Amino acid sequence: MTLTKVEFTASLISKYGFDKSVAKQFVEQFFEEIRVALANGQEVKLSGFGNFSLRKKNARPGRNPKTGESVAVSARRVVVFKPGQKFRERVENVKVKS
């Protein structure tokens, strides 16, 4: 099962009694703050959860898996998430669906 933004918003409404529009705005703004910080080159540290950062990936040769044709993969920035210790401990013994 996947937790979506809609389900996250519904959880805020049921657990804390938020108005639907307030809960939706809160969730959207939370993720927007993370996006803006990363776009500005800042690392995002959420205590007890983990860190989001950007990593530069160099250009490299690649291959189209369908045709086998060689293609150039351009340099880019990718988002990296490193879970914090408390987060890792909480999910350590969670059973994963196979």
From Swiss-Prot:
Disulfide bonds: none annotated. The keyword Calcium does not apply. GO terms for molecular function: DNA binding; structural constituent of chromatin. The keyword tRNA-binding does not apply. Pfam families: Bac_DNA_binding. Heterodimer of an alpha and a beta chain. Belongs to the bacterial histone-like protein family. This protein is one of the two subunits of integration host factor, a specific DNA-binding protein that functions in genetic recombination as well as in transcriptional and translational control. This is Integration host factor subunit alpha. It comes from Haemophilus ducreyi (strain 35000HP / ATCC 700724). The gene is ihfA.
